Amino acid sequence: MEITDLIIGKESENISDIYIFLYEEGPVVFDASAVHLLFYFPEMEMESVLCSDRRRHRVIRGLALEPVLERLAQYPCLVDDEYIRVMGVCE
């Protein structure tokens, strides 16, 4: 799976946010964000995936955005062309 420097940078510093990266195939959540999201949606499936940086990353993919954003609506949210950032979910 392709992982960009943007994703690696965001997730390497992430302690309390959920970053949902917008891939053509659909939304994907990596590493710390995947762990945070699993807390709110234990029914989601987290995988360990070998990515383009030759490392294994925790990944949740194939999620539906609407129920996730509805459930996390009480948290501030930033929307970008490449990702959605839900802030402060684990403070």
Each predicted region: which residue ranges?
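Basic, polar low-complexity surface loops/patches
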Residues: 1-91
